[in-house]
Amino acid sequence: MSAIQNFNTVDPFADTGDDDAQPLNNIHIRIQQRNGRKTLTTVQGLPREFDQKRILRALKKDFACNGTIVKDDDLGEVIQLQGDQRIKVMEFLTQQLGLQKKNIKIHGF
């Protein structure tokens, strides 16, 4: 009597080892309305490999606007810029940092 005992578990949804798979983390660029015509642009979901302070400094210099980094419990570090800078931020992220457009989502009006 031969009994086959296979105690190994197989997870069909486990990582197959493909290095080509893109992370599911997207970068979200949003605009928020403030008083009257004033707006804020927020950038969240930047990869941790980038120094957010240096990115903020470059964005402020290139766009001639003020900005800050806000720490949120759920979202992590969020970059806030004054004004509607959505398109400019997307171009900066793709050209200067080499991120792909398909991983950047623009929200707003």
Curated annotation (Swiss-Prot):
Among the GO biological process terms of this entry, one is: cytoplasmic translational initiation
The Gene Ontology terms for molecular function here are:
ribosomal small subunit binding; RNA binding; translation initiation factor activity
Q: Does the keyword Protein biosynthesis apply?
A: yes
Q: Which GO terms describe its cellular component?
A: cytosol; eukaryotic 43S preinitiation complex
UniProt KW Phosphoprotein keyword: no
Q: InterPro entries this protein is in?
A: SUI1, SUI1_dom_sf, SUI1_euk
Question: What is the recorded name of this protein?
Answer: Protein translation factor sui1
Q: Which organism is it from?
A: Schizosaccharomyces pombe (strain 972 / ATCC 24843) (Fission yeast)
Q: Which gene encodes it?
A: sui1
